[in-house]
């Protein structure tokens, strides 16, 4: 069996024994993070929002009104924690050995997907990009600018 697994969800499984909100953050540069939140209870995760790219301010807003304990994981966790984590009640940084994605997290996320019947063939696997790459954004801007020049 084969299934596509969210890197953010795989990271969240590193903190599944935590009781509260697992905030996953991968540094997306330009003061943004790839972000997802999960409720961790009794060794299971419940997704609270889809994977998305958000500004650091949006990340702060997503957590500051939540009363449950919060733990940050991912390579953007330190950035988020340094930017706003110390100002949010009940927010902590996961220990380094639990902060990054591991094969075990991918396996746990895949097990959940397989139990829900979300398997596919290897040929059907495709990446799920949350935003265009810098080269794609610059190309789109050049095309838009050249189109505006032609149209007057």
Where are these regions (language model features)?
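Surface "functional belts" at beta-alpha junctions
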Residues: 1-101, 129, 134
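Acyltransferase
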Residues: 94-152
